[in-house]
Regions:
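N-terminal intrinsically disordered/low-complexity leader segments
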Residues: 1-9, 150
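Hydrophobic/aromatic-rich alpha-helical bundle segments in the mid-to-C-terminal region
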Residues: 120-124, 128, 142-190, 194
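Short, basic, alpha-helical segments at the C-terminal edge of helix-turn-helix-like DNA-binding modules
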Residues: 62-68
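Hydrophobic alpha-helical connector segments
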Residues: 59, 73-103, 153-160
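Short coil/turn segments at alpha/beta junctions that flank glycine-rich nucleotide-binding fingerprints
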Residues: 24-28, 99, 144
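Amphipathic alpha-helical segments used for helix-helix packing
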Residues: 84, 97-120, 169
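Helix-turn-helix
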Residues: 13, 17-59
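A ubiquitous short alpha-helical element
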Residues: 55-56, 73, 89-96, 121-128, ...
Length: 196
């Protein structure tokens, strides 16, 4: 009897392997051969699922973004205002090994997105979603009296996005120098400034 292959599961295994290779070896080290070996498949097994490396890399970024969004949804459930803002940001900031590895994936993705319209569009869509959500949390915090700053909610969302993405770069380049407590403290200090 022939073996039944779950193609969605196989794609996910390949994307997970890509994620691990990029985190370990960087974008240039993420060859189709390395990815296949990491996933435990023959090199040719990737082609039916991802005909090109760029498609696989784009899927890996999408996977990281989806994982982050799943964590954000879980951690912000039932929260509003500043508590929701803090929980959202804490899931993006590189506060543990998993999130540092995610930073190691998105940074080379940004480099590729500079010259690839599809990757740039994926990034733009992702950041637009985050900006919309952060702005809504800011508006809820302002309505609850938790934010008093005259800076508008969209501008606060810009600040928080820049802080989170910048922290990913800094920690990926020198993780030993930036402990999670420092980043969490910086976030708390910024949120305290918004109160007034």
């Amino acid at each position: 009897m022939p073996k039944i292959v779950d193609h969605d599961q196989r794609r996910l295994e390949l994307v997970d392997a890509t994620w691990r290779i990029i985190a370990k070896l960087g974008m240039e080290g993420a060859t189709m051969r390395e990815i296949a070996e990491e996933a435990g498949f023959a090199n040719g097994a990737l082609k039916p699922y991802f005909p090109t490396k760029d498609l696989l890399l784009t899927s890996a970024f999408g996977h990281v973004f989806n994982r982050t969004n799943q964590r954000i949804a879980t951690m912000t459930e039932g929260l509003s205002g500043v508590a929701a803002l803090r929980a959202f940001c804490a899931e993006v900031l590189p506060l543990d090994e998993e999130r540092v590895n995610e930073a190691r994936i998105v940074i080379p993705f940004w480099q590729k997105a500079l010259n690839d319209a599809d990757m740039a569009a994926l990034h733009s869509e992702s950041m637009s979603q985050w900006h919309t959500t952060i702005t809504a949390h800011c508006a809820a915090a302002r309505a609850a009296g938790e934010i008093a700053t005259p800076i508008g909610d969209a501008a606060v969302a810009d600040h928080l996005l820049n802080m989170m993405l910048g922290a990913q770069i800094v920690v990926a380049l020198s993780p030993a120098e930036h402990f999670s407590q420092d980043l969490a403290g910086q976030l708390d200090n910024y949120l305290a400034l918004l109160a007034g």
